């Protein structure tokens, strides 16, 4: 952890996103929110780094995150159209196509292996962030705890109590929508209103010019 003046602390974090799980969970709560999660990762990433500050016992100290590793795991067949939004925000993408007729893929295995590999990274990460409601990651969280690493999970929809208990901080889908995605819908609405006002103003100006051109040109002597 890097300490800065005035009680500021920066947590070095590694982020792992189970896209299919989170997108499906958010879609059950709010389809628009799921779309915003998929198409504007930069927004909620900024919230993770600066907006979501870890609670601390000292009122003069707060933590900011520096997400140094960003990895997203998705099914390219079902969700390939969202891939570019994550690459544009410096995510490494792991394609995890379905392996069975039921649509089961290998996301959980790939994520678990990458998380455990990151434990041995030259950069000692203070915190591991897992975006998934899959309780199969419970043993991974317990391993991270044994190595004295802070953990944060974002569950999307409902998650098992044992899974949530294994993490230091739990963000459910409702809080993520309210805080991490807040303002996105309002911004879209404001953009639409602004565009409509511009069109209306342009129409009025064009109408005035047309009327002025048709009026006789009176001159005084």
Regions found by a protein language model. Give the residues of each.
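Domain-level signal for Mg2+-assisted phosphodiester chemistry and nucleotide/NA-binding surfaces
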Residues: 1-110, 120, 145, 150-152
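Nuclease catalytic cores that cleave nucleic-acid phosphodiester bonds
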Residues: 78-215
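Accessory DNA-binding and partner-docking regions appended to nucleic-acid-acting proteins
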Residues: 219-221
């Amino acid at each position: 952890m890097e300490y800065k003046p005035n009680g500021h602390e920066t947590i070095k974090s590694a982020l792992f996103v189970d896209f299919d799980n989170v997108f499906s969970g958010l879609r059950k709560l709010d389809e628009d929110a799921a779309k915003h999660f998929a198409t504007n990762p930069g927004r909620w990433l900024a919230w993770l780094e600066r907006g979501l500050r870890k609670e601390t016992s000292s009122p003069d100290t707060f933590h900011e995150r520096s997400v140094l590793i960003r990895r997203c795991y998705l099914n390219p067949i079902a969700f390939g159209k969202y891939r570019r939004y994550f690459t544009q925000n410096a995510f490494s993408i792991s394609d995890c196509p379905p392996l069975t007729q039921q649509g089961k893929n290998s996301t959980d295995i790939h994520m678990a292996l990458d998380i455990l590999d990151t434990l041995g990274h030259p950069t000692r990460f203070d915190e591991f962030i897992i975006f998934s409601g899959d309780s199969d990651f419970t043993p991974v969280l317990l391993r991270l705890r044994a190595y004295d690493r802070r953990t944060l999970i974002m569950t999307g929809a409902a998650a098992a109590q044992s899974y949530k208990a294994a993490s230091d901080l739990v963000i459910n889908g409702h809080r993520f929508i309210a805080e991490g995605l807040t303002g996105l819908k309002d911004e879209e609405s404001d953009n639409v209103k602004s565009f409509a006002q511009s069109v209306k103003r342009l129409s009025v100006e064009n109408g005035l010019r047309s009327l002025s051109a048709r009026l006789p040109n009176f001159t005084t002597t």
